Design a protein with these regions (language model features):
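Glycine/threonine-rich flexible loop motifs
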Residues: 109-121
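Conserved anion/nucleotide-ligand pocket segment
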Residues: 158-232
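Glycine-rich oxoanion-binding loops at beta->alpha junctions
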Residues: 70-100, 112
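Glycine-rich, aromatic-lined ligand/substrate-binding cores of catalytic
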Residues: 200-281, 285-288
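N-terminal phosphate-binding or glycine-rich loops at protein starts, especially the Walker A/P-loop
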Residues: 2-48
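Glycine-rich, charge-decorated loop segments at or immediately adjacent to ligand/cofactor-binding or catalytic sites
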Residues: 62-65, 136-158
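Short internal beta-strands
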Residues: 50-57, 138
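Conserved functional hotspot residues or short segments at active or partner-binding sites
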Residues: 255-377
């Protein structure tokens, strides 16, 4: 295990940046220090915190996926936690920011553009720039490494909560690097400071460090789930297929009541995809799609994560289900998810899967999975070059 110190574990650097400032804190579930103390509590005890802001899952991760997150009083600090994630906004208002000098952002990310916290970070940077406030990002390790770039790339016209800023599906950046990338490439003009991680290298996964895994969101229960999420999240855009939410193996179990699990597993095994096996499985989700119904499908078993391709595996699995059961496939419409950046009344894409893929050609049948990956090859290479300028780690 490699010893690693996230930004929150470096008091001397934090003191240089935060002492004497009125702080607004944005944090969430899983953001703890090495002593398992939530970052919000560390900051409140050490500095003058005058505002707490919550995003998708609450400042302590106490809300579930898709649940409305209101403003509320935090039981530990006694402070009001102001909601900055609702149908109107994903950043503090000018009035909220008037009570702070610096916004401190410390949130676990998932290494994918689907994870809404990235886009919250960018929106908060823009709000700080407009209000003349500083922003300090306490960086954390990239949980599935900072090397492999996968999937499709957002076009310049795409501005959604699951895709923006020319990002690839698997971003291969830390949150601090992402903030630097957005600030530099998109001219945000935020007075930005990143307190880097110490001891982490780009090729390292979370479970190769000495850091404890606490849930960054309710369904990401470990490094493997996070790696699977980087691809299997696309099934959130398929109304009729469960991605395993409501089970103990989200993103590892994929299925539906009408699927023949043995046949699907056999077809996927025949594809010879590297680093992964497929086992036929039965499961019954307690919530989400097909709740209370017995589903058949596959359990996706990562055997070699260096060889495993998250996005390719997921899109070819969807290809296979689509080939087997063309009449059963139905797409979620644009109202799925909780997107405030691109409301349904102003869609670039009409289907939620189009947003997750950053491309409408797949659902319309213009390309299959391999064709979609090939279509975005040049864009992935360009993204990889652009982001490298903002790397903080070797």
């Amino acid at each position: 295990m490699q010893q690693v110190w996230n930004g929150i574990d470096q008091p001397e650097q934090m003191d240089r940046e935060l002492k004497g400032q009125r702080l607004g804190v944005v944090s969430g579930g899983g953001a703890v220090d090495k002593n398992l103390c939530p970052a919000v509590d560390v900051l409140c005890r050490r500095y003058q915190v005058t505002a707490l802001f919550n995003t998708i899952y609450g400042i302590r991760g106490e809300f579930m996926y898709g649940e409305r997150v209101p403003s509320y009083v935090d039981r530990v600090t006694g402070m009001e936690v102001e909601s900055i994630f609702n149908r109107e906004r994903i950043a503090p208002t000018p009035e909220m920011l008037s009570r702070v000098d610096t916004v401190v952002f410390d949130i676990r990310e998932a290494g994918t553009r689907f994870f809404e916290y990235l886009h919250c970070c960018a929106a908060i940077m823009k709000a700080c720039a407009a209000a003349g406030k500083r922003m300090v990002v306490l960086d954390r390790v990239a949980p599935i490494g900072g090397v492999a770039v996968e999937g499709t790339v957002c076009p310049p016209t795409m501005h959604t909560i699951v895709g923006d800023y020319g990002l690839a599906s698997r971003t291969a950046m830390t949150m601090g690097e992402f903030a630097r990338y957005v600030n530099g490439e998109y001219g945000v003009g935020c007075d930005l400071t990143v307190i880097p991680v110490q001891g982490w290298r780009r090729e390292m996964y979370f479970d190769q460090t000495d850091l404890p895994w606490l849930l960054p969101s309710p369904s990401l229960n470990g490094t493997t789930a996070n790696l699977l999420y980087a691809g299997m999240c696309i099934f959130e855009g398929v109304r009729t297929v469960s991605e395993g939410r409501g089970t103990s193996k989200p993103f590892e179990l994929i299925g539906a009541p009408w699927i023949d699990g043995r046949e699907l597993a056999a077809r996927m095994t025949a594809r010879g995809l590297p680093g992964v096996d497929f086992a036929p499985v039965y499961f019954k989700p307690a919530s989400s799609k097909h709740a209370g119904q017995v589903c058949q499908g596959v359990q996706v078993l990562v055997r070699d994560r260096q060889a495993y391709a998250s996005f390719r595996t997921a899109i070819l699995l969807l290809d296979t289900i689509r080939e087997m059961y063309p009449e059963q496939i139905a797409w979620e419409d644009n109202s799925a998810g909780h997107d405030v950046l691109q409301p349904p009344s102003q869609p670039l894409f009409t289907r939620y899967l189009d947003k997750l893929l950053a491309d409408a050609d797949y659902t319309s049948g213009v390309v299959d999975g391999e064709g979609l990956i090939a279509k975005h090859a040049a864009a992935r290479q360009n993204y990889t070059r652009r982001k490298a300028k903002y790397h903080l780690y070797d």
